[in-house]
Amino acid sequence: MNAVTILHVVFAIFFWATGVTIMGVYNVAIVVAYQGILMLIKKKKTYLAYVLTCIEVVVHAVLATLFVGFSSGFQVYCVAMIAVSCYITFVWECFKNGTRETLLFSLFSMFGYFVCYVLSLYCEPIKPVHEIAQTIMYIVNALFMFIIIFCFVMLLFWDINHRSDRLAAKNNQLDEMSKKDPLTK
C-alpha cells in the first residue's frame, strides 16, 4: 500500500504541475482513502479492501483520461490490475472462488481500459496538458505498469514454488512415516 500511496503523490504533483488542480486534489484524497483501505486490511476485511482498490484504479483511469487524455497513459493501470488480480485471488484466503474472481476482476479492469479508450475517441480532454508532459507521464505510467506486472508475476511464481516445496516436504514426511507404520506395510 505504501507504493500505491507514493504513486498517487507522484500523480498529485504531476497534476498540480500541469494545472489540473482538481485531479491533484483527487489524488491527495486517494492517498487518504488508501490509508483507510490499509485499515481494512489490518481488520482482516481484505475482500472489501481489494474491491475498493479495483474500483479506485478504474475510476482514476477514467477521470485521468477525461481530464488529460488517453495519451497520458493512466489507463495502463487497468492492464496491470490483471496481474494483481491473479496474484491476490490466488494468495489471499478470502477469495474462495479464485478463478471466477480473477476473471471478474480482470474483466472489470479490461472494461475500465476500454471505457478510457472510447472516451478518448468521443471526448476531448477537459484540461489538455502540453505534449511533452503527456509523453513524460505516458512513459512514467508505462514504466510503473511494467514494474507492477513484473513484481506481481514474480510474487505469484514465488508463492507457487513455495507451496510446491511445502507439499513435496509434506509428502516426503508422510512417506517416511508410512515406512515406519506397521499398518501401511
Where are the model-predicted features located?
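Conserved nucleotide-binding and Mg2+-coordinating catalytic segments in signaling enzymes
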Residues: 175-185
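The first (N-terminal) embedded transmembrane alpha-helix
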Residues: 1-7
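Alpha-helical transmembrane segments
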Residues: 7-10, 35, 147-154
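Alpha-helical transmembrane segments of polytopic membrane proteins
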Residues: 24-30, 135-145
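Juxtamembrane segments at transmembrane-helix boundaries
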Residues: 8-128
